[in-house]
Amino acid sequence: MPLFKPTGLLVDLDGTLIDRESRMSRPVARAVKAAAALVPVAIASGREPDDVAHFARLLGLTCPQIADNGARILDPMTGRTLHELPMPELDSRRIVDELETRGIKYYAVDGGRVARSRAEFTGWSVTVIAAHAVDRGACDRLLADLSSGSLHVVPSTDAGGSYWYANFTRAGVSKGYGARYFARVTGADLAGIVAVGDSHNDLPMFAEVGMPVAMGHARPEVKSAAAEVVGSLDQDGLAEAIERFILTPLS
């Protein structure tokens, strides 16, 4: 069996890089910085672009980063959007109207800015909508109710795995799309990219890369889609993944 040759690293944010309080451990920060000295590194998150750019800058990452569940690629140094794929306006308006009718909290990214109520939307160039759900069942029902053929829908959880989100992006747009775009612009071979995550919205990314790695606290269906499983967030699992699949092979 040929040795794995790492060419890049993609890391989920909540539950992988940071905890519920948005804290990053020192071992994880050191490991990410060490990896970035060897291969292109990007955060791949469902979060809004400002959050992704903030943590990328903390780590000194300079290559394009992935926000909005793959619908937005950004320059972390300037915060400028390099590439975006909004969902159809009819879908975004329909989803927002229904969420507000039901009294469900959500956030959306419209033209790169976060909106949490209909009054905050401006151009309806919406790349992602993430609606809060009390549990997995409620999340799945929401996705089924509001889905359409022009959308990609996926559940996700917060860093602690306690809160669920129903995520909506344009059809064909996911962290998997973001991984392909990242590989193209950085020149990293997809077969050599290490992707580390803990939630369902990481599954499309796992399907695209050569080394999908699940965090130890990830749900069974996420672990089963991974090639390897590392320690949990509390055990600095991301640092373990970087040591095993980036630093050691390139030492």
PLM-predicted stretches and their roles:
Residues 3-6, 25, 169, 174-251:
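Mg2+-dependent phosphoryl-transfer enzymes with acidic/Ser/Thr/Gly-rich catalytic loops
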Residues 8-10, 64, 194:
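Hydrophobic "anchor" residues on beta-strands that sit immediately upstream
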Residues 38-42, 62-63, 127-129, 191-192, ...:
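Short active-site oxyanion
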Residues 59-62, 69, 77, 147-149, ...:
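Short, structured coil segments at secondary-structure junctions
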